[in-house]
Amino acid sequence: SIFDKLWERHVITGQEGQPQLMYVDQHYIHEVTSPQAFQGLRDAGRKVRRPDLTFGTFDHNVPTVNIYDIRDVISKAQIDKLSENVKDFGIEHAAHGSELQGIVHMVGPETGKTQPGKFIVCGDSHTATHGAFGAIAFGIGTSEVEHVFATQTIWQVKPKKMLVKFTGVPPKGVYSKDFILALIARYGVAAGVGHVVEYAGDAIEHLTMEERMTICNMSIEFGSKMGIMNPDQKTYDYVQGRPGAPKDFEAAVADWKTLVSDPDAVYDKVIEIDVSQLAPMVTWGTNPSMGVEFGAAFPEIRDMNDERAYNYMDLSPGKKAEDIDLGYIFIGSCTNARLSDLQLAAKFVAGKHIAPNLTAIVVPGSRPVKRVAEKMGLDKIFMDAGFEWRDPGCSMCLGMNPDKVPDGVHCASTSNRNFEDRQGFGAKTHLCSPAMAAAAAIAGRFVDIRQLPEVQ
């Protein structure tokens, strides 16, 4: 498989089945999981071994209204510390407020540093996003961040391999976010544990790079640290011309073309999903597997987890997504804040206005995305419809910055996690596609977007 080929290229020492020392081609860092790692280097009198293979950005704590108005003491300390650390250790970075700044899993691909064949790590669980390019990419802990800083290597046990084949043509109103939410709803949040998940099939091949990133992004919610896809012409076209793209691009592509799974590749587990049978997805509970197709009733209580989820969400079995009274809409996050996500959402709000008593925010995932979106007039479409148009950052995906959902309020969110208190204390999160979130903003509740003229 592609994973085997990449793994073999990066092993320095060690036996399969045991921890093996792996070479890291690209290390992304942000302000939350790096301070202690940098301090460890200082205490040991070490340098960052390959600052040229390290890239930093500011995202988790960044306010999206006034990015410099950081009132939380810990948030400010983390941002100030990363500014100091990247300077002291000579690390390239998208400075706070700079023209490149944004969510780490968007900035990496946008700069062209994420490429097929690379072994990529970052102190963030959604690092699997970069696997959409045909790279091994996964999240690591702070002590591992320090190890990579010091050695440009990491100890890792080779995981088992799972193949998830998405086949067929999706119905109108069904998007890549629905593919991954449907997979997780069917098989659970632990199905991928101990495996790298390779996503393949004609339905994946027909997706754009941005749509593919959405699927790989949520591998961790499926239980897998790593998601990967075979690179193809769309991948090469995306990377070409970006600042970090290989200088001898033709030679790089010739190599990348060898980095695909062979027809006879063997997997430990295979799952097939016919996307023509899928529907728009909405989560009802407190983990991403607690989701249903729009129109389906929420399930009966099967265990204590379900009971707790229903109590927290103030919902009950038999209810449907359209019964939820929404108070907030969040379009953003490293899952769905790319240009195509914003274009899709804008289609559903153009010339309309959000429902009364509703707060709706759009947070582009990076400064470049925001810039292009504004050139296209997307900001005006959203603001005319009553949305707030924000600066880039992780924003309302997690309660680490000023963007929080109030206690007890239901939020339609294009992010990746619906845990208790994830978007703020007592916040009730419903994961969905940008199209579902945008349409819900207008109606004040979830609607069947398949019936709307925007999808025809």
From Swiss-Prot:
EC nos: 4.2.1.33
Record has Oxidoreductase as a keyword: no
GO molecular function, one term: metal ion binding
Recorded catalytic activity of this chain's protein: (2R,3S)-3-isopropylmalate = (2S)-2-isopropylmalate
Domain of life of the organism encoding this protein: Bacteria
Keyword 4Fe-4S (UniProt): yes
Role: Catalyzes the isomerization between 2-isopropylmalate and 3-isopropylmalate, via the formation of 2-isopropylmaleate.
Subunit organization: Heterodimer of LeuC and LeuD.
Name of this chain's protein: 3-isopropylmalate dehydratase large subunit
Organism this protein belongs to: Streptococcus gordonii
